[in-house]
Amino acid sequence: RTKSRGLGDVYKRQEYANTRIQGIPINREKGTAIIGHGDVKRLLLSMRSLTEAMRALILVSSEVMEKAHVGDNKSIMREGFLIPIIKGWSTELAQEVTSNGVQIHGGMGFIEETGAAQYMRDARILPIYEGTNAIQANDFMFRKTVRDNGKVAKELLEEIKIDCEDNIEISEMVNLTTKTLNYILENRDDQEMLSCISFDYLMGFGYLIGGWLMDKAKRSANKKLSESSKNEMFLKSKIISAEFYDFHILPRIEYHFKVVMKGAKVVQLTNDSFI
């Protein structure tokens, strides 16, 4: 459902941006559609790259689940690790994607005529049912990371490191994630502290996995383009989405992991502090 919300919204907002005339984009003629505006392009690319990353995560996780179903022990462990990311990270991003869809429409997006607001309302319930994202984050922190001393997390990080060794941006984020994981394990006995940063830990790891899978898609698209001109536009769009993710989305990991390593103390307040 998260994926379908995102995909439907991306296609509808792109269609609108290609036909809506408003303002004069820089270096464009009067009467150019709003897709000519730089920030509209940014919003559309953000929607597309995030949705493609979510879709990739769900597809890869489906394969892991099938292997787990027939008793593959490594897949069983990885399935458990990925589920809270699917539920937590993806549903948070669904809200962002649908909110961007409203933004592209401007004031028209806020009313019912365009349908953009309905997508946003539908996405808002996603982080609540099937367990709120706070529950998913605590599950990811305590049961899927701390309980096995980071075994599954470390294995996945090593796989990403090897697979993306030629991608400088992802390699840097793998190193940062490893550092963050070690910090969490060093503080494993302070459960109150870890509960204050579990959401950011989940989000940061989700963005890393998304970047890894987008890089896989980019490499596959480049390979196919070198072999044939078939589906050229589609393959080039995959490459653009992956490059956008590298430079616009991947840096979010630094934000989330800085919160993990520096931000718990300010949240560990007494109830009186909120009065």
Where are the language model's segments positioned?
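Single conserved hydrophobic/aromatic residue that forms the stacking wall/gate
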Residues: 1-11
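Alpha-helical transition-metal enzyme core signature, strongest for iron centers
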Residues: 5, 47-58, 90-97, 130, ...
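Glycine-rich cofactor-pocket loops
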Residues: 12-48, 63-80, 162-168, 182-199, ...
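Structured alpha-helical bundle/scaffold domains in large eukaryotic membrane-trafficking regulators
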Residues: 21, 25, 56-66, 102-105, ...
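Acidic/histidine-rich catalytic neighborhood
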Residues: 30-73, 111-135, 139-147
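Short amphipathic alpha-helical segments with heptad-repeat character
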Residues: 45-48, 84, 91, 171
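Alpha-helix capping/hinge segments and adjacent helical runs
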Residues: 80-156, 244-269
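C-terminal amphipathic alpha-helical interaction region
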Residues: 147, 163-275
